[in-house]
Amino acid sequence: MRYNQLSYIPTSLETAVAELQALGFAVQQEQAPKESFAIFLRKLFFHFQDTDYPLSHMIATKELDLLSFLASDEALTKEVFDLVALQVLGFIPAVDFTDTQDFIQKIGFPIVFDSQQLLLNLHQLLATRQKSGVTLIDSLVSQGLLPMDNCYHYFNGKALATFDTTSLIREVVYVEAPLDTDQDGQLDLIKVNIIRPKASTAIPSMMTASPYHQGINETANDKKLHRMEGELSPKAPRRITVEPTDFQPLATKPSRLPVNECQETFSHISSYTLNDYFLARGFANLYVSGVGTAGSTGFMTSGDYAQIESFKAVIDWLNGRATAYTSHKRDYQIKADWSNGLVATTGKSYLGTMSTGLATTGVDGLAVIIAEAAISSWYDYYRENGLVCSPGGYPGEDLDVLTELTYSRNLLPGDYLRHNDHYQELLSQQSQALDRQSGDYNQFWHDRNYLPQADRIKCEVVYTHGLQDWNVKPRQVYNIFNALPDSLGKHLFLHHGEHVYMHNWQSIDFREAMNALLCQKMLGQNNGFTLPTIIWQDNQKEQTWKELTAFGGHSKRQIALGEDHVLIDNHYGEEDFKRYGKDFRAFKAELFEGKANQAVIDILLEEDLPINGQACLKLKLKSSENKGILSAQLLDYGKKKRFGDLPAILELDSIDNGQQFAREALKELPFKDSPYRVVTKGVLNLQHRSGLLTIEDIPNDQWISITFHLQPTIYHMAKGDTLRVVLYTTDFEHTIRDNSNYALTLDLEQSYLLIPTDEEE
């Protein structure tokens, strides 16, 4: 374990003492340090009437147990404090460490002992994470240090788990959205599942906008998958134009219906454990699936501003600007009189995507988005540089396939009977509009691009993204983060995993940092918390995070690619083509082993290379036909320790998100030997060599120059490392599988790689 403590808020001695005393630690500024230390330690064992017993099982020095030390005349030193603090945090001498001071350095222990400031040290110790992944104070509260009295209690600017999760209110309401997406003449109703504590004051909300949450139709999804095999068709030269997105919600009027209490409840809904963490701390949890999902009405419009409006309507209802009904009969309205109107949105992938879309509406009441692995442009999810490009791991998927998956109204037989015929008509229109034949950007995709609306965002923004996420690729967060107004509070966590959550990792106190931020923004706590702009996981060291100022370096380093002409064949023999089509992972494995059709250029680095941004290939090439796909990957090549893609479980159920509530596993990305690592990659239709909106001819067998930006990343390579450039045509995971007999020839002497770095000019 290594500490990267973002969430602790430095405080005054007076505040620290007051907060310790409020928790029952009977310390005083006038006490001798050792006396305060003893009082603090005995309070930790509040379950014991005889606190001598647990103290006797800890050690203070190599010669004295802790009980004997406290009774002795020995002074409280840094060595004693550190050794005892480590044990309090769950580290075991002779098991986890032997040399205390060496271990303190190794784990980056965040507390610097000062006998004159011991109470501040103890205050920070309570706010420091244990080996198990929870802070010491959260561990104590989970054991019953404070009662579940449904009132807010704070420590170091963060809410504690004092809301009763054994007696929660669960209710369903139906919010009226200013939409008629299924064209039935009635405004769409949006089902909202609410879980909230029995609080006596108005409370904020965590909202997860998840089109998956009311169920998914995997059968329809699988039937809709598109065939990847086919020929890349040459396109007529032209300049693509689009109009600004012009979504207009329908008019609504305040309801005059009588107000009633909730008429529908539920017992269980799958939850997100970060929401559970906040539920125990006095935040309502709302799960909303939006238009076209089971329990709601409307059509699944998949990513456009109509879908986003269906989630926005819920925030409007929480603020008294929209109507919610107790049932589909629409005979009673229900008020959110328990809400303080402030909302934070959470969730990964599609869920985080809806957070970004919501933020671009500028809706009042949306205080914070915590968007993980979020899409900012749906074109960049299903297309890339003029090519149909399946998201990593899902060849054949497209937006109409996702519509089939998430249109969960068809899981209700009555809805299927009444509405499926019309749904199929609307789905057919969607399939045509997305234009899978050309792969071009068009109005359909522009209406699902949130980047042009980024200047409307006014809430606090937190993004997390994996730099090995080839599902929602890093360009998604790179573009939106760099499009945000400078006036915003914006924050980005970049890790080296794939499409994963990171709130339960051992090496970083993400949950606690979000607690401090949300208490500041949604509960009026003037806690002085400041979250860094960019927090990046160092790829060269285990469990190490660094603060950065920018995603995208201003310096460039030009790297030559060689002096030869190289030929890349597109065509495979029938057996290999079928084998790769059946298992794209076999293709990837053989590509990295040098067995596929490819050109490989190995570059031995003569100095450190701190990559930050979009690597760019400047190439001179020609195609034997009037078409061509170019795919590229940059590898950190050669055996050494690197991160794995998926977090591994360190300890099951070690994280308690409340008081014996919603336990989850502690995880961390493994750091182990590997033969290579993908640094970045990309695919390009050569007809789009001058940009996404420009289609050009490819003259047969004539040299052309291309500019090819790969996915952005932040990745540091060291002097002596090998940077491998892999160039090929068809990518069996992502692109159309065109087996036509053409070849690309590259003039390496007239080509080079341009690497953005975070070096100073």
Curated annotation (Swiss-Prot):
InterPro entries associated with the record: AB_hydrolase_fold (IPR029058), Galactose-bd-like_sf (IPR008979), Pept_S15_Xpro (IPR008252), PepX_N_dom (IPR015251), PepX_N_dom_sf (IPR036313), Xaa-Pro-like_dom (IPR000383), Xaa-Pro_dipept_C (IPR013736), Xaa-Pro_dipeptidyl-ppase/CocE (IPR050585)
Catalytic activity: Hydrolyzes Xaa-Pro-|- bonds to release unblocked, N-terminal dipeptides from substrates including Ala-Pro-|-p-nitroanilide and (sequentially) Tyr-Pro-|-Phe-Pro-|-Gly-Pro-|-Ile
EC numbers for this chain: 3.4.14.11
Active site: S349, D469, H499
Any GO BP annotation: proteolysis
SUPFAM superfamilies hit by this protein: alpha/beta-Hydrolases, Galactose-binding domain-like, X-Prolyl dipeptidyl aminopeptidase PepX, N-terminal domain
Cited Pfam families: Peptidase_S15 (PF02129), PepX_C (PF08530), PepX_N (PF09168)
UniProt keyword Hydrolase present: yes
Primary location recorded for the protein, binned into one broad class: cytoplasm
Keyword set, alphabetical order: Aminopeptidase, Cytoplasm, Hydrolase, Protease, Serine protease
Cited Gene3D superfamilies: 1.10.246.70, alpha/beta hydrolase, Galactose-binding domain-like
Its biological purpose: Removes N-terminal dipeptides sequentially from polypeptides having unsubstituted N-termini provided that the penultimate residue is proline.
Summary of subunit composition and partner proteins: Homodimer.
Family membership noted in the UniProt record: Belongs to the peptidase S15 family.
NCBIfam families for this protein: PRK05371.1-4
The protein's name: Xaa-Pro dipeptidyl-peptidase
Originating species: Streptococcus equi subsp. zooepidemicus (strain H70)
